[in-house]
């Protein structure tokens, strides 16, 4: 059996990051983690474009337009949707997740779902690097690996 693995090298990659304006204290940490991961793995800051979305619900459309532009090898979507007392959370979190997945599947451009969906602000802060790991960095690493793996798939 042939085992095909990708490397975590971003030297020649061009990424877009989309982040939400809501919960910016949390999201800013995710963006910092994403940028740091990209640069630490050989990417150049000038090959990383950052787009600010009004909210998580708008992210899929922005991701779709960026993917269709042909300018990016991958897109990293970052945000924080924190559960409240209404059903609004379910619609926003579900809509963002489905839209981001559909963008990736329909365009063939890898798009990471780095939107935190948590019950509390504390949980979101922990996932943004306060206690353990930074989901922005993790989403970026997943995209670096995915792009490099896709490049190894033979074209027919």
Curated annotation (Swiss-Prot):
Pathway terms, separated by semicolons: Cofactor biosynthesis; riboflavin biosynthesis; riboflavin from 2-hydroxy-3-oxobutyl phosphate and 5-amino-6-(D-ribitylamino)uracil: step 1/2
Q: What class of enzyme is it?
A: transferase
Q: Which Gene3D superfamilies match?
A: Lumazine/riboflavin synthase
Keywords linked to the UniProt accession: Riboflavin biosynthesis, Transferase
Positions bound to 5-amino-6-(D-ribitylamino)uracil: 22, 56-58, 80-82, 113
Q: Report which reactions are catalysed by this protein.
A: (2S)-2-hydroxy-3-oxobutyl phosphate + 5-amino-6-(D-ribitylamino)uracil = 6,7-dimethyl-8-(1-D-ribityl)lumazine + phosphate + 2 H2O + H(+)
CDD domains in the record, alphabetically? Lumazine_synthase-I (cd09209)
Quick one: which residues bind (2S)-2-hydroxy-3-oxobutyl phosphate? 85-86, 127
Q: Return the Pfam families for the record.
A: DMRL_synthase
One GO cellular component term:
cytosol
Purpose:
Catalyzes the formation of 6,7-dimethyl-8-ribityllumazine by condensation of 5-amino-6-(D-ribitylamino)uracil with 3,4-dihydroxy-2-butanone 4-phosphate. This is the penultimate step in the biosynthesis of riboflavin.
Family to which this protein belongs: Belongs to the DMRL synthase family.
Q: What is this protein called?
A: 6,7-dimethyl-8-ribityllumazine synthase
Gene encoding it? ribH
């Amino acid at each position: 059996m042939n085992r095909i693995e990708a490397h975590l090298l971003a030297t020649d990659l061009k990424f877009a990051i989309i982040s939400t304006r809501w919960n910016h204290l949390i999201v800013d940490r995710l963006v910092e983690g994403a940028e740091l991961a990209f640069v630490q793995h050989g990417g150049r800051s000038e090959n990383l474009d950052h787009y600010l979305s009004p909210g998580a619900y708008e992210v899929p459309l922005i991701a779709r337009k960026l993917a269709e532009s042909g300018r990016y090898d991958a897109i990293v979507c970052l945000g924080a949707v924190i559960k409240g007392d209404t059903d609004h959370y379910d619609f926003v979190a579900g809509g963002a997740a489905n839209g981001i997945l559909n963008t990736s599947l329909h365009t063939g451009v890898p798009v990471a779902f780095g939107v935190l969906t948590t019950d509390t602000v504390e949980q979101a802060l922990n996932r943004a690097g306060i206690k353990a790991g930074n989901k922005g960095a993790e989403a970026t690493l997943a995209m670096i690996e995915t792009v490099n793996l896709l490049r190894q798939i033979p074209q027919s």
